From Swiss-Prot:
GO cellular component: cell outer membrane
Listed Pfam families: Inh (PF02974)
Name of the protein in its database record: Outer membrane lipoprotein omp19 homolog
GO molecular function: endopeptidase inhibitor activity
Positions where lipid (N-palmitoyl cysteine) attaches: 19
Biased composition (Low complexity): 62-72
Organism: Rhizobium meliloti (strain 1021)
Length: 179
């Protein structure tokens, strides 16, 4: 019993010794209570204000094209034909699951009637490119507009058959929805 009491006492003493702070020089010999010296103020140069001169010479940017190209999201030649031949579409007929084909790959799209901003909630699964950002949609006339999560249009589609919509993304990629 005495040996176990002595061993326990020795263990307590060793444990308490490990909790004490000791200084052996080197890192511990510095006075840690002393604050660092304050920084000295430096002179600040004066600030001047004035009007900038107008740009000289030709503009560094090329002139915008006036014909031959459509603005992003605007109807291109084939889309104009699709718009005039498009079938009528209602929001209710769009609700549900759609199979999307775009840029040679397929994915799923889900459309609901839950309001989200200026459109209705929607989303994609397994899509690539611009369609990954799809967050809402709306029907505008005979056109179905897919929008990103900020409400910006990313694709426009037209009803071409009973359960089929065709169109393109703003980047020009063809998109088809079918059931």
């Amino acid at each position: 019993m005495r040996v176990s009491h002595a061993a326990a006492g020795l263990a307590v003493v060793l444990a308490l010794t490990g909790c004490q702070r000791t200084s052996f020089g080197g890192f511990g010999s510095q006075d840690v209570s002393r604050a660092p010296a304050p920084l000295q103020a430096q002179p600040v140069p004066s600030v001047s204000a004035g009007q900038l001169p107008p740009p000289a010479g030709a503009s560094q940017f090329p002139a915008a094209p006036t014909t031959g190209t459509a603005a992003p999201g605007a109807a291109a030649g084939t889309e104009v034909a699709a718009a005039t031949n498009a079938l009528d579409v209602t929001k209710e007929s769009m609700v549900g699951n759609w199979r999307v084909s775009s840029a040679g790959s397929s994915c799923d799209m889900f459309l609901t009637l839950t309001n989200l901003g200026s459109g209705s909630r929607g989303g994609t699964r397994g899509c690539a490119g611009e369609l990954t950002a799809m967050g809402s949609w709306e029907v505008a006339g005979k056109q179905v507009v897919l929008k990103d999560r900020s409400g910006n249009p990313i694709a426009r589609l037209y009803k071409t058959a009973d359960a089929r919509f065709d169109g393109s993304t703003n980047g020009g990629q063809p998109v088809s929805l079918s059931r």
